[in-house]
């Protein structure tokens, strides 16, 4: 375990009977693979250190703060034959895994991922914090290239968007309407899928 807070690092290491490292370089060099769970602004530099050290890594989402950084990271990982897995864990949620066999020919999908305001992850907007999970699920379920995207977002309490809506049109004709908010009164997770022969709501 490595953390910039030495006391917290030792506390976690003691709790799980593992070693507390004094530097990120020492931790990376001692590992077979690395799980990078740091604020988004540090993803690129930390992941690059892992790749340079030849370590496979699991990187919390979003991959980086910018598309340019993401492309550089992917290119470097490919060049060094490093496994770079991004933490889009919702795709492996048991509900999504159960749903998957029933998705045959989706025509319209409505997705809501709403949550109350929190001081967590304010360095990125709601699209890369919450909606990114639903975009990943949609791409996985629809299995078609994206043709068109119309999106809008608004800042309410943060410097980045707190509310966002995206309408995604796929090449196969499926349309998805995706809503994300981190300024809602209560938490809501809902997916509604309309197909020619069925309606699924979870």
Where are these regions (language model features)?
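NAD(P)-binding Rossmann-fold cofactor-contacting core
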Residues: 1-13
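Beta-loop-alpha module in the N-terminal Rossmann-like domain of NAD(P)-dependent dehydrogenases
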Residues: 16-74
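A short helix->loop->beta-strand "cap" motif at the edges of active sites that frequently abuts
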Residues: 18, 53-55, 80-83, 174
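Short loop/edge segments at beta-strand edges and connector loops
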Residues: 22, 38, 59, 86-88, ...
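Conserved SAM/SAH-binding loop
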Residues: 23-25, 113, 154
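A contiguous active-site-proximal alpha/beta segment in oxidoreductase catalytic domains
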Residues: 64-121
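Mid-domain beta-loop-alpha active-site segment that forms a flexible
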Residues: 87-94, 115-146
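Contiguous beta-strand/loop segments that form the cofactor/metal-binding neighborhood of enzyme cores
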Residues: 136-202
């Amino acid at each position: 375990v490595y953390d910039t807070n030495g006391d917290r690092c030792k506390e976690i290491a003691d709790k799980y009977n593992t070693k507390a490292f004094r530097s990120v370089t020492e931790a990376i060099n001692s590992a077979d693979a690395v799980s990078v769970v740091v604020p988004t602004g540090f993803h690129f530099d930390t992941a690059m250190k892992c790749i340079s050290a030849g370590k496979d890594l699991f990187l919390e989402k979003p991959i980086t703060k910018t598309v340019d950084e993401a492309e550089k990271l992917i290119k470097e990982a490919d060049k060094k034959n490093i496994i770079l897995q991004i933490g889009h864990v919702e795709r492996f949620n048991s509900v999504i895994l159960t749903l998957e066999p029933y998705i045959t020919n989706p025509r319209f999908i409505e997705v809501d991922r709403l949550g109350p305001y929190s001081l967590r992850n304010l360095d990125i907007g709601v699209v890369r914090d919450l909606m990114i999970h639903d975009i990943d699920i949609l791409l996985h379920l629809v299995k078609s290239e994206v043709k068109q995207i119309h999106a809008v977002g608004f800042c309410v309490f943060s410097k980045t968007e707190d509310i966002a809506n995206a309408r995604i049109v796929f090449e196969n004709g499926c349309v998805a309407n995706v809503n994300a908010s981190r300024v809602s009164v209560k938490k809501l997770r809902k997916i509604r899928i309309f197909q020619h022969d069925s309606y699924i709501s979870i």
